[in-house]
Every structure is written in structure tokens, then in C-alpha cells.
């Protein structure tokens, strides 16, 4: 945690790498992440403040102190979230993804470690666009590794694919990952429990196995099963998902939708990183407009500039 213009901020320092090849790859990923962060704005996306390339690769964002969704869920076990709370969090995630997809951005690493809570632990924000890519009609993307347990099967199902080799996939990979996160929100259990990451990937890709959607309300079960369909083209988009979640929430009684009190951390609390590969940006709530589609910055700032007031 550092301070910039009298506000606490999160600073992500990216190691430049040890070899020329690694340095080129990491700088490219850094440039891509900063370009995307600076081009979109939404209340469920971490607020971008700035970045610099030299002397170190640094990304500065708002500071979220509510902790990761992963840490929050683990703290509740063996209890589960109330359905309206779980679906409310899912709605935050779906709206963030709707915004990214509207700007042609695929996240590719949607998982609880990359979802952070505001100080009151009532709102979820999406972070870490390190694996994100802009989608074009002609682009063929590399089979880079996200986190197998949450990744869409089409990202890794071609076993002959070598590192850096190209393959086709589209924004629907995020819809599959969203379904796995939604299942986890509803059950508060690790998806594919009892399997290693590679076993879970094999089961999903080659045996078409999914976590059980039994014992859920029919409407939620239908959302899950539609989102994790094997054929990406049969999965709904996030605009449709938002509407499905809103419809489900509208069917709940007023008593069911009363939000319970939640324990929350001090705004000055510094929480540890959750797992390798995540940005670990812990932040307070930004005052951003609630625009479902998101919007571009009115005056885009320069991407790479150092912060004389950061210390």
C-alpha cells in the first residue's frame, strides 16, 4: 500500500524477467494490461490510476481492503452464502464481464482470487487483466495458461498444442469460467473437489464432467448448465446472464433479499497475496457510475508515466 494525492492506492510491481525473451514477453503483457485497464471504467472493475514502464513496471490502482472472494469464502466454511448474496456477487461479476466484452476484451483468468471485495464486503470488483486479450475477428490467440480448474476446456483441450502455438477461441471462455465461479458461490466448495488441477481439466475437457447442479433452484441450475456447455456457441453472453440473474433475484421474497451484516476490514488493512499469479490489489470502493455497459475515459491519460507523489 502507498499513497498518491492523499489517497491510499495499491501498487503492483511487475518483475521484468531474467532473459531477453522473458523480458519481451512480460513487457508485452504489461503494456496490454495497462492499455485495457485505462480504456474501461465500471463500478465492478478495479479503478485504474496510472502506470509507469521505467525504472520499474508499475501499475497503480485503487486500494481494495475487503480481501479476495477466495479468502472471504474460505472464512465462511463450512457455511454457505445466502442465495441472494451469492447471486448478488455473481451479478457484480457478470456486469464487469459485460463491460469488458463490450470493449472487445477477454479476461481468460476469471476465478475467486481475481475478484476483490470492497471494504463493506458487499460489492465485488474484478482485477488482474494480465492474461486478458483484445478480441478481433481474425486473431488467433496463444494457449497461455490461466488456472485449469476454472478455465474453459477449449483453452487447453488440444493436447498437441505446444507453448506459443496458436488456436482459435473467443469471449465465451469467460462465460464458462463464470459458471464455475457461480457454482462455487452457491456451494462454497472448491469445484471438482478431490481432483488436482490437471485432473479437473482432464475431466472437463475429455469427459465433459461438470460440478453437480442438482439440489439448486431450477432457474439457477439452468443458468449454470447453459454457461458451461461444451459448445461455446451455445453459451449465453453476459448481457443475457445479467438479465437471467436479475430475474432470479426478482423471484425472491423481500425477507430473503435483506442483506445480513458482514464483518469488514479497516481501510488501512494490508492483506497478503492470495496465490501466485494474482495481482493482490486490495482496495476501497471507488465512486464510479453504475453503467452496465461501462464507458471509455473522456480524456485518456498517458499510459506510462511515473508518479512523483508516490512514495
Features from the language model and the residues they span:
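A short, aromatic-enriched beta-strand patch in the conserved N-lobe beta-sheet
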Residues: 50-51
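Conserved catalytic-loop aspartate of Hanks-type protein kinases
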Residues: 174
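Conserved N-lobe beta3->alphaC-helix segment of eukaryotic protein kinase catalytic domains
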Residues: 14-39
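Glycine-rich ATP phosphate-binding loop
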Residues: 1-18
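Activation segment signature within eukaryotic-like protein kinase domains
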Residues: 89-90
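A conserved loop-to-beta-strand element in the N-lobe of protein kinase catalytic cores
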Residues: 54-62, 70-71
Amino acid at each position: 500500500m502507498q499513497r498518491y494525492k492523499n489517497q491510499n492506492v495499491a501498487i503492483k510491481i511487475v518483475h521484468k524477467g531474467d532473459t531477453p525473451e522473458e523480458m519481451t514477453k512480460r513487457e508485452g503483457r504489461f503494456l496490454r494490461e495497462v492499455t485495457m485497464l485505462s480504456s474501461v471504467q465500471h463500478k465492478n472493475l478495479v479503478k485504474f490510476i496510472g502506470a509507469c514502464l521505467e525504472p520499474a513496471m508499475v501499475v497503480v490502482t485503487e486500494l481494495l481492503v475487503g480481501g479476495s472472494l477466495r479468502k472471504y469464502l474460505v472464512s465462511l466454511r463450512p457455511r454457505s452464502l445466502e442465495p441472494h448474496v451469492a447471486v448478488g456477487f455473481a451479478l457484480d461479476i457478470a456486469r464487469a464481464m459485460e463491460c469488458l466484452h463490450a470493449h472487445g476484451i477477454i479476461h481468460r483468468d476469471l476465478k475467486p482470487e481475481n475478484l476483490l471485495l470492497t471494504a463493506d464486503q458487499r460489492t465485488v470488483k474484478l482485477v488482474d487483466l494480465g492474461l486478458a486479450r483484445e478480441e478481433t475477428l481474425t486473431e488467433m490467440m496463444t494457449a497461455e495458461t490461466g488456472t485449469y480448474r476454472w478455465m474453459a476446456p477449449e483453452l487447453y483441450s488440444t493436447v498437441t498444442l505446444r507453448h506459443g502455438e496458436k488456436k482459435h477461441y473467443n469471449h465465451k471462455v469467460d462465460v464458462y469460467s463464470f459458471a464455475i465461479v457461480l457454482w462455487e458461490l452457491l456451494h462454497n466448495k472448491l469445484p471438482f473437489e478431490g481432483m488436482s488441477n490437471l485432473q479437473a481439466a482432464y475431466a472437463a475437457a475429455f469427459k465433459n464432467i461438470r460440478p453437480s447442479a442438482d439440489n439448486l433452484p431450477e432457474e439457477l441450475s439452468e443458468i449454470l448448465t447453459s454457461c458451461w456447455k461444451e459448445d461455446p456457441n451455445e453459451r449465453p453472453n453476459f448481457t443475457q446472464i445479467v438479465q437471467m440473474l436479475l430475474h432470479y433475484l426478482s423471484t425472491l421474497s423481500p425477507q430473503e433479499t435483506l442483506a445480513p451484516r458482514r464483518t469488514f476490514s479497516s481501510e488501512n488493512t494490508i492483506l497478503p497475496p492470495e496465490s501466485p499469479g494474482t495481482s493482490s490489489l486490495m482496495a476501497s470502493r471507488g465512486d464510479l457510475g453504475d453503467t452496465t455497459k461501462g464507458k471509455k475515459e473522456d480524456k485518456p491519460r498517458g499510459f506510462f508515466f511515473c508518479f512523483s507523489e508516490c512514495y
